[in-house]
Swiss-Prot record:
The active site is at 164 (proton acceptor). The keyword Cytoplasm applies. The gene is rlmE. It catalyses: uridine(2552) in 23S rRNA + S-adenosyl-L-methionine = 2'-O-methyluridine(2552) in 23S rRNA + S-adenosyl-L-homocysteine + H(+). It comes from Shewanella sp. (strain ANA-3). InterPro entries: RNA_methyltr_RlmE, RNA_MeTrfase_FtsJ_dom, rRNA-MeTfrase_E, SAM-dependent_MTases_sf. Specifically methylates the uridine in position 2552 of 23S rRNA at the 2'-O position of the ribose in the fully assembled 50S ribosomal subunit. Its EC number is 2.1.1.166. This is Ribosomal RNA large subunit methyltransferase E.
Amino acid sequence: MSGKKRTASSTRWMQEHFDDHYVKLAQKRGLRSRAAFKLEELQEKDQLIRPGMTVVDLGAAPGGWSQIAVKLTGDKGKVIACDILPMDPIVGVDFLQGDFREEKVLEALLTRVGADKVDVVLSDMAPNMSGSDGVDQPRAMYLVELALDMCHQVLAPNGSFAVKVFQGEGFDEYMKAVKDAFKVVKTRKPDSSRARSREVYLVATGYKL
């Protein structure tokens, strides 16, 4: 067997082992998805969420990020989650099922937020992938643009934003838009993010619009 083949085989094995580790760890800890570890890593580096904060979690189902957020905000905080898909209840999380592009769903979400605005907007949204970059990338960019629009509607001054973005066409323009809206923007690739994935997370702090 050639060195190249050994390397490819080893890489596949390592990736499978890596994936199994986070899937099993999520199950062991009672977390609903391996994605929860991504938010934990972002929190460890950037301290986005503190006790008493109000957090909006977009694309929340099955609830991995909401599980982490509600622990971090504590009894005096508030987590408002929204997804088109259903999500089993999480104690302390106010879940709204629906498409926030629809006016009635958006109004319901804004009612839950109230007049005080929110401290953090989270988005781990991703489209159903077809395998075609020409289809998937525009869909993915559309979702992250919606998430940034939500910041403009609900985020308090100096608030924070964490969003999953897929690198590709439209990424640079989106990065500029986020930098225009926030004082500091960092790009993160959590260890729990699959190495083969083009996903990265933008962590933006100091909302200024």
